[in-house]
Amino acid sequence: HHDPIIEKPSDWKQLKQPEVEYDDVKTNRLYEAAGDALGDILEPKLVGVTNFSFHMMHWYCDYRGLNNMMMDLIDEPNMVHETIRFFTEGVKSMLKQYEDLNLISLNNDDTFFYTGGLGYTDELPAVGFNPDGVRLCDVWAAAEAQEFSSISPAMHEEFILSYEREILKPFGLTG
């Protein structure tokens, strides 16, 4: 049983869009401390964001519960659309902040990729790559909605796939 955090449509209004903060001084201090502590054993590597996996229907279920989500698709479809749109806009805003703050690192190497493998590919980074400013088109991303395994293809398209495609569009590869 799941007691929903969000009980009525107006409760969603309490959520705020993500705001990315980065403290360069603190990050470098921690990086240097790790190097001092581990430098003889292994070399720390300073990287930015490498994991781009999006689970908006899972987030919805975290707030409403799986049973309520299933009922909402029929009883409150506008609430579902408004919420997934809110999540979509939040993710897009967060991604822009990552790019603006230069916080993205390549993930076409031994970085674990959400779908269960490693990111190795020679298709990334994209043409025009600049190592001083990794772009979304230079990296992998993924999205999923396992909660929709029992939902019709039409509802899957309507309630989540169209939003996921919007988020994944700027990425170099998706899986």
Where are these regions (language model features)?
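Well-ordered mid-protein domain cores that form the structural environment of catalytic cofactors
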Residues: H1-Q17
